[in-house]
């Protein structure tokens, strides 16, 4: 695989992993706890999301896979949505740190490209925990 392909796949599988179903949590509690790479979203993304949905976002960032993994492996983090990289995803799944996605609460799941989901499945074999991000 080319360097571009690996980079693309890593970005792609930097899947939105749910510690709980963000959709149901947001609907019930109106707060979404996100743990993402620093500088992954535009400065106004959270504010725009909050304005559009009425859901408050608590947005925390990390700057390395090791920091993310240390927090996840330590136990209950309280995060609803976590954005790991593909290279650490399989190990985190094996450790049981994520809950399965509730696809009934992801109405656009059906619109995802099957070829892209096959790439994600290389790290999450049944597409139970991860979904494409980029």
Where are these regions (language model features)?
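Early extracytoplasmic/lumenal segment of secretory-pathway proteins
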Residues: 27-92
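A structural signal for short loop-to-beta-strand junctions that line the ligand-binding cleft
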Residues: 77-81, 99-134
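A generic structural signal for secondary-structure junctions
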Residues: 13, 73, 94-97, 102, ...
């Amino acid at each position: 695989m080319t360097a571009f392909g690996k980079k693309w796949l890593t970005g792609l599988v930097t899947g939105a992993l749910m510690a709980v179903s963000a959709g149901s949590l947001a609907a019930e509690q109106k707060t979404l706890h996100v743990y993402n790479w620093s500088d992954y979203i535009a400065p106004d993304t959270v504010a725009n999301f909050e304005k559009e949905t009425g859901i408050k976002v608590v947005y925390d960032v990390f700057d390395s896979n090791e920091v993310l993994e240390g927090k996840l492996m330590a136990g209950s983090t309280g995060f609803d949505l976590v954005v790991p990289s593909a290279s650490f995803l399989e190990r985190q799944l094996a450790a049981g740190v994520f809950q399965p996605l509730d696809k009934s609460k992801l109405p656009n799941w059906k619109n995802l490209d099957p070829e892209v989901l096959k790439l994600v499945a290389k790290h999450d074999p049944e597409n139970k925990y991860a979904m494409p991000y980029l």
